[in-house]
Amino acid sequence: NSSDRTPNILASAQKEAESQGLTIRHLTENKIQSSYAARNTAIRASTGEILAFTDADCRPLPQWISHLVQPFADPAVGLVVGEINALPGETLLEKYAERQSMMTQKDTLAHPFCPYGQTANLGIRRQVFAEIGLFRPYMTTGGDADMCWRIGRETAWKLVFAETALVQHRHRATIAELKSQWRRYGRSNRYLHELYGVDLMRDFTWKESVYRLSRWLLKELPVAGASAIAGKTPWLDAIASPINLYCAINRSAGQREAKLPEPAKTIEWL
């Protein structure tokens, strides 16, 4: 559970919203430690036909809701995926993530098994939850893909990509945060493999890691460094390979060490 003054911050936000004629409801989910359980709590408390999802580390742009909701004018649409851009950061890793377009929904929508959108920017029609259930509350990662895949494979609801419905995401600023992020991505791979049989990424060996790092030092860095010195490309491009390698190593480790807990197979219902 949060210990960073979240309740106090929300109480202050509630008062400010009330002064502007808006309503904010502070809901608490403290029985199950997962973001998906928290989302289920909010879904049950909601009364609207369209539910919009974003994350605490995201900043929706003006007109986000209107652009996200617009495709639902088509009664056949059950799922709308908005785009995720980087919130401009100061650290090297934040700038790297922005340069790599990390977390763009275009990547997840191109998933070879089935398209999906991340809950950082997602709209779902309430009727969908009545048909296929809520998020798996005991999943700790991969629940957004699971939800979208259940919609895509078990229903006739259409998915629409609303590229102009934008949120900005605050990327990881430290090595520790980056490691945690990519380990979690690896666990997600494993969980979705156990639920759907999707392919796992191949295991990353230290021998391959040494080879790729050596290749970067001897071949890629001299070329990319010269290009950066000449002002043709950003310096970030010159150091992207070792960061990519670090991410891949941690994703592989997360996948290798994970196993889907039995309770995580449970689907809650409205």
Report residues per predicted region.
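Short aromatic/hydrophobic "clamp" motif used to bind/position activated sugar donors
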Residues: 51
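Acidic donor-binding/catalytic loop of UDP-sugar-dependent glycosyltransferases
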Residues: 5, 9, 58-71
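Non-catalytic, C-terminal membrane-associated alpha-helical segments of glycosyltransferases
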Residues: 183-187, 201-270
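Acidic donor-binding loop at a coil-to-helix junction in glycosyltransferase catalytic cores
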Residues: 141-147, 154
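Short, flexible, basic/aromatic active-site loop/helix in glycosyltransferases
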Residues: 82-83, 97-114
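Conserved donor NDP-sugar-binding/catalytic core segment of glycosyltransferases
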Residues: 63-93
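Acidic donor-binding segment of Leloir-type glycosyltransferases
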Residues: 1-28
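Glycine-rich, basic loop-to-helix element that forms the pyrophosphate-binding segment
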Residues: 29-46
